[in-house]
């Protein structure tokens, strides 16, 4: 089913890892760190440049604004930078490991051209794939899949995932024809946007994913073993 494609573009949550990972692990880790991060911020702190881009001087208001963005799951590029900074600390300390599906790990390792497209920042994507829970090893062991991935795209590099132009931008950047690419995601709006430039699409149907109305109009993949 996937042998006709030379290039694969993958979404992350709900596609290569459980959709719950972001909301039940990454978001809570971030929101727990925000108060201390904001209150202890100084002009020479590493995160000061990111926080200053919100243009909110009052620390209480800034903290409330950041937490509101998270609660509403707003795809704000400044928020994504800040999340990447905080999550880096979690990954590097061993507190966070990404539960990438075993079939997705195998898929990424065996396919020649694999690219990632997520609303999370490129930095956050590289962290996630750099600290993957090894399904065949003790809990403290992790895998680094970044060497198997050919490139990363986010809303800053390419645009919103629900806009067709974003996929045209990606095709340009990877130097591929639309007919050569298969895009896999759990979001039908993203699939429709990619199809708008002729990219083949597949709906990822993983445990915990929300039901998709008219899901029968998409090629459905419950795992990547058939690709």
From Swiss-Prot:
Cofactor: Mg(2+)
GO cellular component, one term: nucleus
Pathway the protein contributes to: Amino-acid biosynthesis; L-methionine biosynthesis via salvage pathway; L-methionine from S-methyl-5-thio-alpha-D-ribose 1-phosphate: step 3/6; Amino-acid biosynthesis; L-methionine biosynthesis via salvage pathway; L-methionine from S-methyl-5-thio-alpha-D-ribose 1-phosphate: step 4/6
Keywords recorded for this protein, A-Z: Amino-acid biosynthesis, Cytoplasm, Hydrolase, Magnesium, Metal-binding, Methionine biosynthesis, Nucleus
Top-level class of the enzyme under EC nomenclature: hydrolase
Positions that bind Mg(2+): 11, 13, 186
SUPFAM superfamilies attached to this UniProt entry: HAD-like
E.C. numbers: 3.1.3.77
GO molecular function: acireductone synthase activity; magnesium ion binding
Family (UniProt): Belongs to the HAD-like hydrolase superfamily. MasA/MtnC family.
PANTHER family: ENOLASE-PHOSPHATASE E1
Function: Bifunctional enzyme that catalyzes the enolization of 2,3-diketo-5-methylthiopentyl-1-phosphate (DK-MTP-1-P) into the intermediate 2-hydroxy-3-keto-5-methylthiopentenyl-1-phosphate (HK-MTPenyl-1-P), which is then dephosphorylated to form the acireductone 1,2-dihydroxy-3-keto-5-methylthiopentene (DHK-MTPene).
Subunit structure: Monomer.
Protein name: Enolase-phosphatase E1
UniProt source species: Saccharomyces cerevisiae (strain RM11-1a)
């Amino acid at each position: 089913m996937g042998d006709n494609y030379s290039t694969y573009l993958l979404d992350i949550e709900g596609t290569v890892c459980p959709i719950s990972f972001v909301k039940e692990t990454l978001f809570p880790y971030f929101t727990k760190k925000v108060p201390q991060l904001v209150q202890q911020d100084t002009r020479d702190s590493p995160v000061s440049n990111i926080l200053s881009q919100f243009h909110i001087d009052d620390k209480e208001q800034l903290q409330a604004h950041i937490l509101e963005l998270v609660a509403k799951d707003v795809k704000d590029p400044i928020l994504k930078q800040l999340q990447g900074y905080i999550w880096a600390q979690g990954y590097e300390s061993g507190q966070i490991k990404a539960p990438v599906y075993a079939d997705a790990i195998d898929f990424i390792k065996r396919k020649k051209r694999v690219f990632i497209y997520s609303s999370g920042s490129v930095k956050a994507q590289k962290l996630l794939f750099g600290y993957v829970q090894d399904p065949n090893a003790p809990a403290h062991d992790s895998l680094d899949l970044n060497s198997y991935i050919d490139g990363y795209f986010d809303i800053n590099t390419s645009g919103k995932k629900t806009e067709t132009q974003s996929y045209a931008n990606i095709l340009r950047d990877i130097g591929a024809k639309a007919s050569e690419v298969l895009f896999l995601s759990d979001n039908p709006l993203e699939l429709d946007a990619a199809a708008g430039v002729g990219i083949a699409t597949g709906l990822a149907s993983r445990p915990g994913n929300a039901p998709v109305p008219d899901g029968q109009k998409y090629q459905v993949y419950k795992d990547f073993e058939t690709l």
